[in-house]
């Protein structure tokens, strides 16, 4: 054999030695029953809970019931083309979503697929939708405020970074408006916002996105949408997807805010899934683990300690009540999980007091720890004063002729403070401006102003301060406190403003 032939033989032998047919093991099952978005699959004996399964045509599903000889899975899409006998593959992956800065400004579904027509999302990291919440050692006490821009909330029910604050009330009482105001108020700040729309009409989600774009809030916001027309499984996954996106920012040492709008529809979706999966129903036909459904979600909101970067994830879950019944099953569950609640009252809303925050029922268990020193100094007694005013106002309905002078003055001032706390929708007020108007209201500068002219007084005061005493507002913003010098300057400003004001 020639030298060239020997070379060819040696090359062939080397290639034979290196040859190894790639072999991959895939767990495969077959559909034995399908309907109502649920597929029962024979086989897949090694499937894991929450594992992604692949159906023909690229439709995905999630294994939720692991039985002795079958698996029940929820289908994440249209089940019209899935039929008995179809092959189902286990992917070996737990339900997950792409996360990272590339998602800011985008609208996605709970699986991270874009819904806004702006092209594919640059995937930076993939995270599981569910994970164990940070333990006690990993956490740090909440002491930094989330400025909502809403006077009634920032003054009386402060929200801290890392807190879980429930927004609860009847239909159309302004729950979503409070959440959107809070998102809009973060413009130019360092808080990344995630808005999770669960079971809403697509038109309403589109209006919300357009509103956020109008106010420049999409620059720091991610929208996760599972519409009412989507598969119920996607509605079930939506809040976990939003939480996973927020956790990525938290673990990078940043601050994030996630709004779940709303967890009532989330509980309905889970109830529907559970009944279709033939799990035993309990109270109001909810499954026995409906409390765990929300506790494992909301416990993931936290303020991490400095060793872990000091990031935070703040949760604003929304619950819709029926006829003001806060003692129903799901509302009481979520109230017991969260660190406080903002209760919106229909009667107050209908009487023109908006935001319709009922101070008596609303509470923030973090309290003044999450307030700036300036707001704490000005508004420390505001909640108690407003509570007393409401009681007096109810009593005074029977007539004020026999009330003493001090009580009548308290009623008069309470009316003016109520007017001050009113606020237009999507008009967040900067913290320094809030401090200025509340200082004026609580120190008698509004006592001589007619109730009907309080709103004009307020808007005029903001313009006057910005034009003539901008340094006062700047000092309050910069120091987050009111020094003796700043307070003196603020008093001078208020005196000058009142002198030039015709009331």
UniProtKB/Swiss-Prot annotation:
The record marks 362 as: Required for activity. Keywords: ATP synthesis, ATP-binding, Cell membrane, CF(1), Hydrogen ion transport, Ion transport, Membrane, Nucleotide-binding, Translocase, Transport. GO terms for molecular function: ADP binding; ATP binding; proton-transporting ATP synthase activity, rotational mechanism. It is a peripheral membrane protein. It is found in: Cell membrane. Pfam families: ATP-synt_ab, ATP-synt_ab_C, ATP-synt_ab_N. It catalyses: ATP + H2O + 4 H(+)(in) = ADP + phosphate + 5 H(+)(out). Its main location: membrane. CDD domains: ATP-synt_F1_alpha_C (cd18113), ATP-synt_F1_alpha_N (cd18116), F1-ATPase_alpha_CD (cd01132). GO terms for cellular component: plasma membrane; proton-transporting ATP synthase complex. The keyword Phosphoprotein does not apply. Its EC number is 7.1.2.2. It is an enzyme of class 7 (translocase). It comes from the Bacteria. ATP binds at residues 169-176. Belongs to the ATPase alpha/beta chains family. Produces ATP from ADP in the presence of a proton gradient across the membrane. The alpha chain is a regulatory subunit. F-type ATPases have 2 components, CF(1) - the catalytic core - and CF(0) - the membrane proton channel. CF(1) has five subunits: alpha(3), beta(3), gamma(1), delta(1), epsilon(1). CF(0) has three main subunits: a(1), b(2) and c(9-12). The alpha and beta chains form an alternating ring which encloses part of the gamma chain. CF(1) is attached to CF(0) by a central stalk formed by the gamma and epsilon chains, while a peripheral stalk is formed by the delta and b chains. This is ATP synthase subunit alpha.
